[in-house]
Amino acid sequence: MFPMVTGFMNYGQQTVRAARYIGQSLIITLSHSNRFPVTIQYPYEKLMTSERFRGRIHFEFDKCIACEVCVRVCPIDLPVVDWKFERDIRKKRLLNYSIDFGICIFCGNCVEYCPTNCLSMTEEYELSTYDRHELNYNQTALGRLPMPVIDDYTIRTIFNLPKIKSK
């Protein structure tokens, strides 16, 4: 009979311990219930990107001197730079510049090491397409600046969301 009594005591201790764990979990759950939601409704609401966000690369054709530093510092040799040497002015003339964003890892080395600052990172991150060949941007597509999230009147940014009053 003694083992049966110790069994009931152990069962009682385990029940109390389980109730305490459930109570602690409930307290944590209730403390999280009055917080601001982390998720957003993506197509209709967008978060503001940080100042140093590494999005799509913007290219300024007029500033490029075809030095190919961007190709040399790229870990995957991604930018394609076509140029022609002009003998009369003894300089390279840029013919074509393209980047395939399906392969790009957005490391930012090309932007950082460009001597003429003709490359910059934008806040555009919506690059999804149905055809992977549409991700190959030439100098015309790279030169278009995206519409900033702040200026897009169809989008509610995180700053425009209603505030939850804390106690």
Swiss-Prot record:
Main localization (coarse): plastid
Record EC number: 7.1.1.-
Cofactor notes: Binds 2 [4Fe-4S] clusters per subunit.
Protein biosynthesis in keyword set: no
Protein location: Plastid, Chloroplast thylakoid membrane
Topology relative to the membrane: Peripheral membrane protein
UniProt xrefs under Gene3D superfamilies: 3.30.70.3270
Transmembrane domains' residue ranges: none
Positions bound to [4Fe-4S] cluster 2: 74, 104, 107, 110
Keyword Magnesium attributed: no
GO molecular function: 4 iron, 4 sulfur cluster binding; iron ion binding; NADH dehydrogenase (ubiquinone) activity; quinone binding
Annotated residues for binding of [4Fe-4S] cluster 1: 64, 67, 70, 114
Residue ranges occupied by any 4Fe-4S ferredoxin-type domain in the UniProt entry: 55-84, 95-124
GO cellular component, one term: chloroplast thylakoid membrane
Cofactor(s) the protein needs: [4Fe-4S] cluster
Keyword annotations from UniProtKB, A to Z: 4Fe-4S, Chloroplast, Iron, Iron-sulfur, Membrane, Metal-binding, NAD, NADP, Plastid, Plastoquinone, Quinone, Repeat, Thylakoid, Translocase
Assembly, per entry: NDH is composed of at least 16 different subunits, 5 of which are encoded in the nucleus.
PANTHER family assigned to the protein according to its UniProt record, in alphabetical order: NAD(P)H-QUINONE OXIDOREDUCTASE SUBUNIT I, CHLOROPLASTIC
NCBIfam families assigned to the protein according to its UniProt record, in alphabetical order: ndhI (TIGR00403), NuoI (TIGR01971), PRK05888.1-3 (NF004537)
Protein name per the record: NAD(P)H-quinone oxidoreductase subunit I, chloroplastic
Organism: Pelargonium hortorum
Gene: ndhI
